[in-house]
Design a protein with these regions (language model features):
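Catalytic pocket-lining loop regions of alpha/beta-barrel enzymes
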Residues: 1-67
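Divalent metal-coordination and catalytic microenvironments
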Residues: 20, 36, 71, 101, ...
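Short glycine-enriched loops at secondary-structure junctions
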Residues: 23-24, 73-76
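Short, solvent-exposed polar/charged micro-motifs at secondary-structure junctions
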Residues: 27-28, 47-48, 77-78, 112-114
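Conserved short-loop catalytic and cofactor-binding motifs
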Residues: 38-42, 75, 89, 97
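Mid-to-C-terminal alpha-helical segments outside catalytic/metal-binding sites
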Residues: 62-65, 79-116
């Protein structure tokens, strides 16, 4: 993660999406000028930290920096519908507003690629 921080400091205008929320290096993510997708790892976060703490972690990273991604084909060999259903089941248990959910699932990605 240190290398990513150095790249972002050297090139502050680069648009970077960090996959899987950067793994479980949660503390290293706070304050980075990057986007974070939570493909595949969201259920793992919930299993490890629970819904409440996962929600807190996502909010500390910043709702405006979160991007939904499918990570298909998922290594868990689930069908796409099962993957999406699980993600949205988890997201529905969190306290995101409708606007925040729309940003995570669509608008943040559009902002991320806007200048490409």
């Amino acid at each position: 993660m240190r290398n990513l921080k150095n790249v972002l400091k050297k090139y502050p205008n680069v648009r970077l999406s960090i996959a899987h929320l950067g793994g479980f290096q949660v503390e290293d993510l706070y304050g980075l000028n990057a986007y974070f997708n939570f493909s595949a790892i969201l259920p793992d976060y919930v299993n490890r930290f629970g819904i409440k703490r996962t929600n807190e972690i996502l909010r500390l990273i910043g709702v405006d920096k979160l991007v939904f991604a499918t990570d298909f084909p998922d290594s868990r060999c689930l069908k796409p519908k099962e993957i999406y259903d699980k993600y949205f089941e988890i997201l529905n248990e969190m306290d995101f507003s409708l606007e925040e959910a729309e940003n995570i699932c669509r608008n943040n990605a559009l902002k991320m690629i806007d200048k490409i």
